[in-house]
C-alpha cells in the first residue's frame, strides 16, 4: 500500500512540473524588455519529470510483477519478458520489507535505458 502512496505523490509532483514555464515572464531593463529565457527552467523540469516518471514506472513494474506471481493465468509473451526483466533485479516479496532499494534499482535501470534489452 505504501508503494501506491509513493506513486500517487510522485504523480502529483509530475502534475505540478507539467505547468508551462513559457507562460512566466520577467520584465527587465525598466520594462523595456521582457526577453528572459525560461528554456533552462523548462529543461530542468523535463529532467526532473523524467526521473520522477521512472520512479512511478518502477513502482508499477514491481507491483505488477508481484501480481503476476500470484495469479494462475499465464501472461502474454511481452508481459513475460518484462516480468522476467524485473525479477532479474528484484526478488519476490516473501515477507514484509522496505521496497525503497528495489524501486530505486529499477528506476535507475529505466533511466539508464537498460530496459531496452527486454525486446531485443
Describe each PLM feature range.
Residues 1-120:
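C-terminal auxiliary extensions adjacent to catalytic cores
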Amino acid at each position: 500500500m505504501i508503494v501506491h502512496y509513493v506513486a500517487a505523490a510522485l504523480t502529483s509532483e509530475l502534475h505540478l512540473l507539467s505547468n508551462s514555464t513559457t507562460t512566466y515572464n520577467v520584465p527587465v531593463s525598466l520594462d523595456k524588455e521582457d526577453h528572459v529565457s525560461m528554456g533552462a527552467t523548462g529543461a530542468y523540469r523535463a529532467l526532473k519529470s523524467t526521473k520522477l516518471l521512472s520512479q512511478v514506472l518502477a513502482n508499477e513494474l514491481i507491483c505488477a510483477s508481484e501480481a503476476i506471481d500470484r495469479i494462475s493465468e499465464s501472461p502474454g509473451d511481452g508481459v513475460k519478458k518484462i516480468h522476467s526483466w524485473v525479477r532479474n533485479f528484484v526478488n519476490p516479496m516473501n515477507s514484509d520489507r522496505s521496497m525503497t532499494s528495489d524501486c530505486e534499482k529499477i528506476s535507475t535501470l529505466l533511466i539508464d535505458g537498460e530496459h531496452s534489452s527486454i525486446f531485443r
